[in-house]
Regions:
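Phosphate-binding/switch region of NTP-binding enzymes
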Residues: 115-236
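Residue-level signature of catalytic and energy-coupling elements of molecular machines
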Residues: 4-5, 47, 94, 144, ...
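Generic beta-sheet signal
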Residues: 3-5, 89-93, 138-140
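Glycine-rich P-loop/Walker A and Walker A-like loops and their local beta1-loop-alpha1 context
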Residues: 1-28
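Conserved inter-motif catalytic segment of the P-loop NTP-binding fold
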Residues: 19-20, 28-124, 128
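Hydrophobic/aromatic beta-strand patches that form the interior of the parallel beta-sheet core
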Residues: 3-5, 34-36, 58-60, 141, ...
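Terminal-proximal interaction/regulatory segments of ATP-powered molecular machines
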Residues: 242-246
Length: 246
């Protein structure tokens, strides 16, 4: 299946993908995990401090980074074919926005067709990849950034770049929004320790869609799921001021 995580800066997109990698590695001992970073912003030491077993993650060839949509298609296809149809696998692309297409790399940036070919290329690529992923036991997580929907009088004010291909081929589409910075006072000095994120699932073929939840991301730790779970239990009336209701 394909999962698309979309969000603006500081919405824990990479952190959420990292959490998925951590959970996968510890659950599937015989599985294969790959992370492809296209923005030159991923810190392995920080990810390891959050619990990611970096030695068990395939980070690709640093001498041959993914630059284009075509590079990504070839790399993911090789990953799927290498592990076979039965072995569980997870492949994270972070992010789709940093990829160009081969035609764009060759032409002048001032040409009128700039950017249009990438959307067409992505549509063709995901149509082919969706079938390969369906026949395999691989989860593909695609991280996307948001762009202002310039000229939009109605509807969404933001959109992802690269066209609408993932709207059709993704099984899950999750939008993340930054709500506020979490702070606490230490020795009379207010210090930030995390961020509060709202996650809205706008498409879901494996569970109930159009649901939202808030969770905390703590710097140097990751997703604070315990607090999120407690808040959810309070919200649905299963947790009182003392403890669980019977």
């Amino acid at each position: 299946r394909i999962t698309n995580i979309i969000g603006d800066k500081s919405t824990a997109k990479t952190a959420l993908a990292t959490e998925a990698l951590i959970n996968f590695v510890f659950k599937y001992k015989d599985g294969n995990a790959a992370y492809r970073e296209t923005e030159a912003a991923f810190d392995k030491e920080y990810a390891e401090a959050m619990g990611l077993p970096v030695k068990k993650i395939d980070f690709g060839n640093p001498d041959k980074p993914l630059l284009t949509v075509e590079d990504f298609e070839r790399d993911l296809t090789a990953f799927i074919e290498k592990q076979g149809p039965k072995v569980p696998g997870i492949y994270v692309l972070d992010s789709l926005d940093a990829l160009s297409d081969e035609a764009e790399m060759e032409r002048d940036i001032g040409e009128a067709t700039y950017g249009g070919n990438k959307a067409k290329q992505l549509s063709t690529m995901f149509r082919k990849l969706a079938r390969k992923i369906e026949m395999s036991n691989v989860l593909l997580i695609v991280v996307s950034q948001v762009r202002d929907n310039i000229g939009a009088m109605f509807g969404e004010k933001h959109k992802r770049s690269g066209g609408k291909a993932l709207d059709f081929y993704a099984s899950q589409i999750m939008w993340l929004a930054h709500l506020k910075i979490l702070k606490k006072t230490i020795n009379k000095v207010e210090r930030p320790y995390g961020i509060l994120i709202k996650s809205s699932v706008r498409k879901n073929k494996v569970a109930i869609a159009h649901r939202s939840a808030e969770f905390e991301f703590h710097f140097g730790y990751g997703v604070e799921d315990l607090t999120a779970s407690v808040n959810w239990l309070k919200e649905i009336g299963r947790l009182g001021s003392i403890g669980l209701k019977t």
